[in-house]
Design a protein with these regions (language model features):
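A Trp-anchored, charged/polar loop motif used as the substrate-binding/catalytic surface
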Residues: 72-77, 118-124, 165-185, 218-238, ...
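Aromatic-lined glycan-binding groove of carbohydrate-active enzymes
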Residues: 186-270
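Long, acidic (Asp/Glu-rich), low-complexity accessory segments flanking structured domains
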Residues: 1-85, 89, 98-131, 136, ...
Length: 317
């Protein structure tokens, strides 16, 4: 199936679920997601980002930025194309750039280099949910740089204003078993927000970080990745004793030696494409011992190898 057909096929996949799946808690559906979701456009004109070790920021140069851009980009598709493809979970890190966005609060996305202002991405997400009123998105903002409490409050205010009335209320307002596709569609809720900072506990529309787990293998070895993944899946109930969303990260993490050794190449060509292909094969094996523990699955370069369709179809197994 080509990308255009996949986008058309999966664009409203939650709307098109049969009722028995719409009545299952979201924590027990198979949901495709993207790793470093908004790294498709990294800006080589801005300095090296704050999430990179200081030693590299000291040797900032056009050559260094080009190398980081090739290895920091984990997605090719922009947010709208990912949404049309069927992605419903987004993994996000943000930074405040003093001098760049102090007045407009254009908080930037980043992964090695700075990307777009997050306001642009949020506007695209808002447009999508208005045009697709039965789709539900999970936004997981999990890394913050150069933030203080005042900036957190301003940013949360921006989110609350933009998505007003669309947030799925967080526990204890609802129990996990109440949060289904059907429930969200009946009430017009379309966004489940994780904002992994303690201050977020003051806001009723933000889900606490205790309701999501995203274990990271932190390996550049594909055999170690699958060993870790299968082990950690069977530990889901211990990791989330009160239940919650579980993210399976089917990704490899390059070391600096990997990057130096292949500096003219990219994450996609050296590691990510092969890993996403293996992830799809692993999912298609449909291991009956592991499938009950799967929930959200994320990869790099989500357009490859029918990843989204493969995950969505697991709901019907």
């Amino acid at each position: 199936m080509n990308q255009n057909n996949m986008r058309q096929h999966n664009e409203n996949w939650m709307r098109d679920l049969p009722l028995f799946l719409k009545l299952k808690p979201l924590t027990h559906l198979f949901i495709p997601g993207s790793h470093q979701s908004f790294s498709d456009l990294l800006n080589k004109k801005l300095p090296i980002a704050i999430d990179v070790p200081k030693v590299l920021r000291f040797v900032d140069s056009p050559w260094t930025r080009k190398t980081i851009e090739r290895w920091g980009r984990c997605q090719e598709l922009n947010v709208t194309d990912q949404l049309r493809l069927g992605i419903r979970y987004f993994d996000v890190r943000v930074a405040f750039l003093p001098g760049e966005c102090e007045q407009s609060l254009d908080i930037f996305l980043l992964h090695g280099l700075y990307g777009r202002p997050i306001k642009e991405v949020l506007d695209e997400m808002y447009t999508f949910i208005i045009d697709h009123p039965e789709e539900i998105l999970i936004l997981d903002i999990n890394h913050f740089y150069n933030f203080n409490d005042e900036l957190h409050r301003k940013f949360l205010g921006q989110l609350e204003h933009l998505f007003n009335g669309k947030f799925i209320p967080a526990p204890p307002s609802l129990s996990l078993n109440q949060v289904t596709v059907d429930f969200a569609q009946q009430h017009g809720f379309q966004l489940l927000l994780f904002y992994q900072q303690k201050l977020a506990e003051q806001f009723s529309f933000i889900w606490p970080s205790s309701y999501i787990a995203s274990p990271w293998a932190n390996t550049n070895n594909v055999q170690h990745l699958w060993q870790y993944t299968e082990h950690i899946l069977t530990s889901r109930d211990q990791i989330l004793p009160n239940g919650g969303f579980f993210v399976t990260q089917c990704i490899l993490t390059p070391t600096w030696w990997n990057i130096v050794r292949h500096f003219k190449k990219s994450l996609r060509t050296v590691m990510a494409a092969k890993t996403t292909e293996q992830a799809v094969s692993w999912l298609k094996k449909n291991n009956v011992l592991l499938m009950p523990f799967l929930n959200i699955v994320i990869v790099d370069f989500v357009e490859l190898f029918d990843f989204c369709t493969t995950v969505i179809q697991l709901n019907f197994q």
